[in-house]
Amino acid sequence: VSASNREILIDPLVSLDKDPVVGLRAAATAAQLGLPLSLDSFTSLAEKLKKGEGALTNPWPREARELLIALIGAGESMVDIFETLDQEEIIFQWIPEWMSVRSLPQRNALHRHTVDRHMVETAVHAAKLTRKVQRPDLLLFAALFHDIGKGAQEDHSERGVRLIEPIARRIGFDSKEIEIVKNLILHHLLLSSTATRRDLDDPATIQSVLTAIPDVNTLELLHALSIADGEATGSAGWSDWKATLVNDLVHRVKRAMAGAEVAPQPEVSDEQSALALKGQLRVSVQEHSSGLAVEVISPDKPGLLSIVAGVLNISRLDVKSARTKTIGSS
């Protein structure tokens, strides 16, 4: 592999059977240096691979796996390289399962890219977060394949777990690493959906994440994957508000993993109790970085929470969580 005229070349005399990782080496080098691949070199590589030359062993040599991770972790410059590998049908020689998501349209209108391009973009965003996790290689690998289960009439996360195991094993990850990757793919929507749809003050909310995620390292990997996935989806699927909620959820789960009480319910203050016992309506609003906290003290009645939520909805305010407390008999 060499650079000439600001592009990466593969020696035409190289034997793929003697050096089967040369294609991955060239792709990773190009991505890391931000240089394009020589089209002639990769057309020739594709033809040789289709003839059965240079087939990688199962499992892959360690160098091949490391080069794949280097390619995935190169950031924005890997997009064009991966596109070339796709157009020349080289990626399918290494990872045949990629064919099932090639140019696959999304069912969710929030997405701005096809399934395959979205996964590539997720890897680009994940590359920015590798210093925040203990196993950047597992983060990058999971990012590139987190939606591999799409394209069938079943839950794509569950199908993705079945598909990723043979891929990860073939690429050379060990059983423990594969279990982590499977967990990330199965639960890649968990943090976002939990943070935005459930009350973070409810102990059951925190417990649901604790049940799914076994340790802090996996939680941090899942957090980074959630951010990368959201950012790759676009502004319609990710925002500062959602990021704040996810961060809050992760912080609470980490505290629980460290042995802290799970989401303790705050006590009602003496002032709040006194106001409630007066039986008069009072509404107060406090502004926080993540939104508004609206406190409503009112005589109880059937449907009170729905009435309050309806008023907020009419005012074009989204209710992200709610907590109620009844004092006395009314």
What positions do the PLM features span?
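Non-catalytic interface/linker regions that flank or bridge core catalytic/transmembrane domains
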Residues: V1-A109
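Regulatory modules associated with amino-acid/nitrogen control
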Residues: V1-I8, D80, P203-S330
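Short acidic (Asp/Glu) and glycine-rich catalytic loops that position anionic groups and cofactors
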Residues: S2-E7, F42-L49, P59-R65, E97-P105, ...
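Active-site-adjacent "gating/activation" loops or surface patches in catalytic cores
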Residues: S2-I8, Q87-I148
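Conserved phosphate/pyrophosphate-binding and hydrolysis machinery centered on Walker-type P-loop NTPases
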Residues: L16, N58-P61, L71, G75, ...
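Non-catalytic, well-ordered alpha-helical scaffold segments
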Residues: D17-A28, R62-I69, V79-E83, E88, ...
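Short coil/turn segments at secondary-structure boundaries
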Residues: S38-L45, W60-R65, V79-E88, W94-V101, ...
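Divalent metal-dependent catalytic cores for phosphoryl transfer on phosphate-bearing substrates
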Residues: T114, L129-R255
